[in-house]
């Protein structure tokens, strides 16, 4: 089985330089891609803004106006954008970062919408008043790919919110090739033990080919969801790894932990445990203490994702995850 197209494109993009004209053409082609991997291929698929026009934005005002526009749109972020804002992303959007672009202090709120792609974005230091770097709430069919999400460990734990939170029954989400780093709170799935009525039976999420480095906890923390984690690498976690809570069903495959505390796959801080099937995972001396679950590769509704193999994860994933397109 061949590697997914998005994985191969990352390798090609880093292998050789190209002219500005070719780079712009590559950017437009990649910004027009639909999600090919994981749960966001379900429910009709995730195409983002491909049905609409393409615009390039260079400042916060332009980015906000384009992202909140109610028509389908592909938005290409160029250069460095900074400020203090919470952008409410509308349905049928692709927001794609050019190589070298960055967004500082601005959170993206994807609430009660559908068909959104966030790709090749570098987002950092979002103040808690502006929410998560990316927050997905009551939304369907969202693809987060090749993003670089970071915070600031020198700040107080509650000064910044999560890097990527998925809550309130959101469905058909894929998080792929993303670099989570230098932050207190990584990724929270399901915000409360008391939200079973909304969350149970929803929160179908794939985490594929991601790199977690120097993150304190929530890598991810999962309540109620059905979550497939494959080809992920956790390095230098500060407190804990994958927290399986509140009847969550989790499948962890072809992944590795290095330089991490004892609790790699565990349960804590909820009324009752979740469950995990763990297949070809190098715990790096850490432990898995979660009861075995029922989510298996054969029960997944989408095409198989090629497993890199735990022995190759540490030398592969850091070179491909993040803003690498």
From Swiss-Prot:
Q: Which GO terms describe its biological process?
A: cell wall organization; polysaccharide catabolic process
User: Is Cell wall biogenesis/degradation a UniProt keyword of this protein?
Assistant: yes
Q: Which UniProt keywords apply?
A: Calcium, Carbohydrate metabolism, Cell wall biogenesis/degradation, Lyase, Metal-binding, Polysaccharide degradation, Secreted, Signal
Task: Describe the reaction catalysed, as an equation.
Answer: Eliminative cleavage of (1->4)-alpha-D-galacturonan to give oligosaccharides with 4-deoxy-alpha-D-galact-4-enuronosyl groups at their non-reducing ends
**Enzyme Commission (EC) number:** 4.2.2.2
- Pfam families documented for this protein: Pectate_lyase_4 (PF00544)
* Entry-linked SMART domains: Amb_all
Q: How is the cofactor bound?
A: Binds 1 Ca(2+) ion per subunit.
For the keyword Cytoplasm, the answer is no
Annotated function:
Pectinolytic enzyme consist of four classes of enzymes: pectin lyase, polygalacturonase, pectin methylesterase and rhamnogalacturonase. Among pectinolytic enzymes, pectin lyase is the most important in depolymerization of pectin, since it cleaves internal glycosidic bonds of highly methylated pectins. Favors pectate, the anion, over pectin, the methyl ester.
Q: What is the protein's given name? A: Probable pectate lyase B
Q: Which organism is it from?
A: Aspergillus terreus (strain NIH 2624 / FGSC A1156)
């Amino acid at each position: 089985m061949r590697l997914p197209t998005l994985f191969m494109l990352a390798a090609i993009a880093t292998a050789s330089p190209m002219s500005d004209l070719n780079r712009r053409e590559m950017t437009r082609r990649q910004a027009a891609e639909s999600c090919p991997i994981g749960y966001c291929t379900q429910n009709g698929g995730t195409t983002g803004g491909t049905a609409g026009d393409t615009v390039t934005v260079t400042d916060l005002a332009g980015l906000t106006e384009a992202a909140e526009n109610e028509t389908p749109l592909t938005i290409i972020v160029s250069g460095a954008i900074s400020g203090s804002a919470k952008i409410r992303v509308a349905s049928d959007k692709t927001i794609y970062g050019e190589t070298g672009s960055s967004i500082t202090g601005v959170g993206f709120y994807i609430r009660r919408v559908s068909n959104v792609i966030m790709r090749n974005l570098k987002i950092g230091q979002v103040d808690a008043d502006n929410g998560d770097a990316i927050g997905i709430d009551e939304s369907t069919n969202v693809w987060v790919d090749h993003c670089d999400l970071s915070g600031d460990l020198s700040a107080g734990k509650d000064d910044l919110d999560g890097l990527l939170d998925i809550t309130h029954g959101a469905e058909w989400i894929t998080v792929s090739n993303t670099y989570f780093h230098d932050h207190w709170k990584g990724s929270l799935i399901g915000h409360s033990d008391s939200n079973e009525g909304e969350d149970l039976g929803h929160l179908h999420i794939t985490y594929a080919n991601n790199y977690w480095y120097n993150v304190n906890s929530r890598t991810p923390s999962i309540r109620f969801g059905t979550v497939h984690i494959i080809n992920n690498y956790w390095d230098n976690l500060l407190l804990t790894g994958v927290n399986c809570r509140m009847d969550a069903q989790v499948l962890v495959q072809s992944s590795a932990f290095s330089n991490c505390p004892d609790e790699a796959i565990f349960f804590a801080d909820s009324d009752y445990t979740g469950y995990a099937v763990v297949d070809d995972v190098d715990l790096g001396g850490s432990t898995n203490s979660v009861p075995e679950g029922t989510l298996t590769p054969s029960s997944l509704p989408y095409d198989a994702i090629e497993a890199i193999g735990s022995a190759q994860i540490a030398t592969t994933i850091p070179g491909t995850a993040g803003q690498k397109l």
